């Protein structure tokens, strides 16, 4: 494919064209030329759009799709099409499928299903067999098959010794462990953040302590073993402080935060709407502000949509019984623009590649074209009728947004929303 993207503002600090409005000429997979008023050519398609911006392709570090096993929630093909039209050229795929992605053949299955699609999929292998927290999965074999990290999605590694052994073992092949932090004993039967809102609604609460105890424990283990650790979707003030302190001590720890935890609070729960039932739970505004500060000072390395499609049968039920999760790919950018400056959003939507040791390409002549196209001034409402995901469980339903992904260019393919 040959295209010329017209008058796009480049948002890429690693590029000499950062913050400049230019034309970008692309021949198949390579950026051929960047400059003003590039001459039209008969065999080049031209892309024109008001308020057009261009950045390195966005990468989401936590996406669940369902397939294999839960295709009623989402398929790989449709899910990656949704990702592309939401601006993501790459996603890290969680292992919470059926069967769990805990061996070489399951990793290969996912890659084979996705290799012809424009958005790249990078599987995360389960840390333990069947994500049951008892025995290590086939970590080395999965690494050789393309797994970029290991984690049991939404489940803490409760066995401290197992995490210690894992942290030591994967150093032999320079791999990364993802450790979700929530002490199940402290959480108990809690379903929302413990606080004024949970008391008012009569719902059982999950104290911040449930997360913070596990964060502190895992950081102690990392200090003992060395190696690298990624802590996903943190949600509390103290978690930010603990990770900031660990980084200052020189520990190789990275972390992420989910879009909904940056934008929403537990005040949304007043209507008992299960769309707001997520894990970790929506916290207070005090925590939300601490998370934003953590993003701004780079304590928090990446922002994820934590996209988790859930079918209506498991959402439209009593709050205590409903499953956790919200879809997030389609609303991520528009929601983030309400709380963060543009440059920081793009930074945090592209930084995940470095954490997972994936190649990134500056916007420069001769480089691979892995690009996201977006606007910042497009007013729109995230309505159910416009959702492309098979599941509609969005915490941002009917939210007014400003700014939207237009599409991507990756692997010689243009996908427009």
Question: Where would I find each of the regions flagged by the language model?
Answer:
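C-terminal cap of metal-dependent C-N hydrolases
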Residues: 321, 368-417
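Metal-associated gating/positioning segment near the N- to mid-region
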Residues: 49-114
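Active-site metal-binding motif and surrounding structural segment of the metallo-beta-lactamase
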Residues: 38-54
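Histidine/acidic residue-rich metal-binding segments in metalloenzymes
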Residues: 137-303
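Acidic, glycine-enriched loop/beta-strand segments at the rims
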Residues: 11-23, 354-385
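N-terminal metal-binding scaffold of metallo-dependent hydrolase/deaminase domains
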Residues: 1-41, 413-414
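Divalent metal-coordination and catalytic microenvironments
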Residues: 8, 29, 51, 62, ...
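His/Asp/Glu-enriched, well-ordered alpha-helical/loop segment
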Residues: 200-226, 297-374
């Amino acid at each position: 494919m040959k295209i010329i993207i017209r008058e796009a503002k480049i948002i890429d600090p690693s590029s000499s064209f950062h913050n400049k409005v230019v034309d970008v000429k692309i021949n198949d997979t390579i950026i051929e030329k960047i400059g003003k008023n590039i001459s039209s050519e008969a065999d080049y398609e031209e892309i024109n759009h008001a308020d057009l911006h261009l950045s390195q392709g966005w990468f989401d570090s936590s996406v669940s799709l369902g397939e294999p096993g839960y295709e009623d929630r989402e398929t790989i093909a449709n899910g990656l099409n949704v990702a592309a039209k939401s601006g993501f050229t790459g996603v890290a795929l969680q292992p919470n499928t059926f069967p769990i992605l805990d061996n070489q053949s399951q990793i290969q299955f996912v890659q084979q299903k996705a290799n012809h699609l424009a958005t790249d999929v990078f599987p995360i292998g389960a840390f333990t067999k069947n994500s049951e927290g008892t025995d290590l999965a086939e970590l080395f074999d999965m690494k050789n098959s393309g797994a970029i990290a290991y984690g049991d999605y939404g489940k803490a590694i409760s066995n401290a010794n197992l995490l210690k052994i894992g942290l030591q073992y994967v150093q032999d092949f320079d791999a990364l462990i993802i450790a979700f932090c929530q002490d199940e004993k402290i959480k108990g039967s809690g379903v929302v953040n413990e606080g004024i809102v949970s008391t008012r609604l009569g719902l059982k609460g999950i104290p911040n302590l449930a997360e913070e105890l596990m964060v502190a424990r895992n950081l102690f283990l990392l200090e003992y073993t060395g190696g690298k650790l990624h802590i996903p979707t943190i949600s509390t003030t103290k978690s930010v402080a603990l990770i900031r302190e660990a980084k200052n001590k020189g520990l190789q720890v990275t972390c992420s935060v989910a879009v909904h935890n940056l934008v929403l609070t537990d005040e949304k729960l007043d209507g008992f709407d299960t769309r707001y039932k997520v894990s970790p739970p929506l916290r207070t505004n005090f925590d939300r502000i601490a998370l934003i500060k953590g993003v701004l000072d780079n304590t928090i390395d990446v922002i994820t949509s934590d996209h988790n499609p859930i079918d209506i049968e498991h959402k439209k039920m009593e709050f205590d019984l409903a499953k956790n999760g919200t879809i997030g790919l389609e609303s991520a950018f528009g929601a983030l623009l309400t709380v963060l400056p543009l440059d920081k959003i793009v930074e945090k939507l592209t930084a995940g590649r470095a954490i997972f040791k994936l190649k990134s390409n500056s916007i420069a002549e001769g480089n691979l074209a892995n690009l996201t196209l977006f606007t910042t001034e497009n007013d729109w409402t995230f309505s159910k009728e416009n959702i492309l995901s098979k599941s509609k469980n969005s915490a941002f339903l009917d939210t007014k947004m400003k700014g939207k992904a237009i599409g991507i260019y990756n692997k010689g393919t243009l996908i427009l929303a």
